[in-house]
């Protein structure tokens, strides 16, 4: 999957198996967690692109530790990669 098709899937929006909701609003990816704090998180398209390109370069746990577990759950769901978080 290339970045443009990944972004198109994000524009559709949805839920991860862990219940996080995601959607695109303008040029930002918004992720709302399903946890008790119901935290909201958003990042720009440029950051999404950088994360999309960096994830294959490192293991999932390393990416989640250095950057964002929330984004990784969405990435794993959209790309079909197993989510080991």
PLM region spans:
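Intrinsically disordered, charged low-complexity linkers and terminal tails
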Residues: 1-85
